[in-house]
Every structure is written in structure tokens, then in C-alpha cells.
Amino acid sequence: MLKYGGTKLSTKTANNLISVSIDLCRDYTQIAYCMGNMAEPDSVSTIAGEQKYLIPTEIGKLNNSDEWCIGDDALLREKNGEAILADDILKTILSEKSIVVSNNTYTGYEILKHFFEGLFKILKSNYHIVQPDYISVTVEYPDRILVNLIRNVLNDMGYDREHVKIIGHSESIIYYMISQKKEIWVNDVLIFDFTKHQFLVRLLTTVRAREPQPIVVEEMDMTQKFKVSDLQTEQGRLEMDTKFLELLKKLCSKHIVSAVFLTGVGFYEKWMEDSIRFLCSKRRVFQGYNLFV
């Protein structure tokens, strides 16, 4: 049995099953949920009734207390002097170093468990979802250390391992793409992921000479050339538009591209002009935060 809004529902009925997806990234985390009778998942807002879907991947410990806070709440409390933040938690976890908060030392497992508890608290308070049946977690790269930590955390929170799936962004994109209309991926597909920390280009190609036809993902890291910090000035935004246009022309000269996806906070800085005009010529272009969740 599971609880939804305080009402017990049978997990044996497909329409009552609740799946929760979590996209855990270095800069932001997102959550979505889906019930069996929903056509597609709904993104979870951190503020009820608003469209606030990005949760900063930040965690803090309240001063003189055992309580923890996450996301914007942690940032606000740290600003007000009410909490101390852990520094860049995913990067530190992957380095297998201990994490120091308020002069206390914590393991990556402990910090990640507090963060996930904060995420599920949002689900419970804003959406009345108490215990989902299935959980999928997407991460930028399915590093063994991080994957094992996530599995252990969720298992200790009461979620059976067989009901938890953890995949990387590249695999997640394939699942997402094949769920779309075939006209979108009839040719190659480009995905640009522009976050605070990286600029990744992924090219999805369907190998039509083989049966069944596999989808191959080629990944290019162009972080050194495209940085969010370069968008702080008007000149930087103009130069970014020019560089991105050059990259697009180069890629589209080598590949027949039927669709382009733009995701990440970097694409919401309103710097694309010539580049977006080029993109939208004879191609389907999609922009959004929740490509991986």
C-alpha cells in the first residue's frame, strides 16, 4: 500500500502507481512525478501554485540545531546568517572527501541523505506524495561512487533497490527521444546543455543500416569556449551569440539535423539572436529545463 494525500491506495492498480523522477546535477536539481493515469509527468514546483522548478543543489545546517535545509531555503538562510552551507556537494562527494559544515565532519552519504530527505519533504508538503512506488534518478554521468551512494541512501529511506533506476543524461535523452514523435528524430538531433559549470553538446544519430536501429550518442565538451560567466556583459553576450552561431553552422554542415534541444540555465540569459534565427530555419527547436527529469 502507499499513501497519497493521506488516502491509502493499492499499488496493484496501475492507475494508482506513482513514479518520481529526480535530476540531480551539480548546479540545480529538478523533480517530476507521474501517476498511471497521467499522459506525461508534471514538474514539481518548490512553491505551491508557482512555476519554480529549479532547486539549487545546495544544503545547509541550521546554526545550533540538527536541522538541515536545501535549495533556495538554504541559500536564504545562509544569507541571513541562520545556516552554514556545504560547499559544492556533488563535486566533493565524487572526490570521496569528507564534507565540513559548522566545524563538523560528514560523509558524502550523510549529506546526500539529508538532501534527498529535503527533496521528498517538498513532494510531501506541496503535492501530498508520501511514498512513491518507483524512483528514477538521472545524473550528469553515472559515476560508480555517486550511483552507489544514491542507491544506499534511497534503500535506507525505505525504497527497494528493484524500484530504483539510476541513469546518466545520455541514456536519459535516448529514452526521452524515442518517446517523441518520430518526425522529431527522423534525422540527427542536437542537444545543448548549458549549465553554470559546463557546456555539453550531444549528437543523437540513428544507425539505419542496422536492425534493430540503435541510437548512438556522441558527446562533446565545449566548456572552455562557452561559460555562463561570459554572459554578464553586453559584449560577452554578443560574442557568445557569434560563437554559438559558428558552432551551429559547423555542426549542421556535417549533419542533417531535424531537431535541436536547448536546456540549462545558460540558455535563459537572452543572448541568442543570430544563432536562434539560424536554428529555427527548417528545424524543430525546443527549449526547457526538464529534458532529463
List where the protein language model places each region.
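Early-domain small/polar-rich strand-loop-helix modules and first-structured segments
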Residues: M1-S98, N155, H163-I167, E171-Y175, ...
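Short helix-loop-beta connector
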Residues: A14-N15, T105, I129-P132, I184-N187
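Glycine-rich phosphate-binding loops at beta-strand->alpha-helix junctions
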Residues: I135-V147, L251-L279, R283-Y289
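Internal metal/ion-chelating core segments
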Residues: I174, N187-L190, F194-L200, L204-D230, ...
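Conserved phosphate-binding loops in N-terminal lobes of ATP-dependent enzymes
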Residues: S45-T138, V216-V257
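ATP/nucleotide-binding catalytic cores
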Residues: Y127, P142-I145, L149-R161, I174-R202, ...
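A short acidic Gly-Thr/Ser loop motif
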Residues: N15, S21-Y28, E183-L200, T205-V207, ...
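Active-site neighborhood for divalent-cation/phosphate handling
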Residues: E110-I178, G288-F292
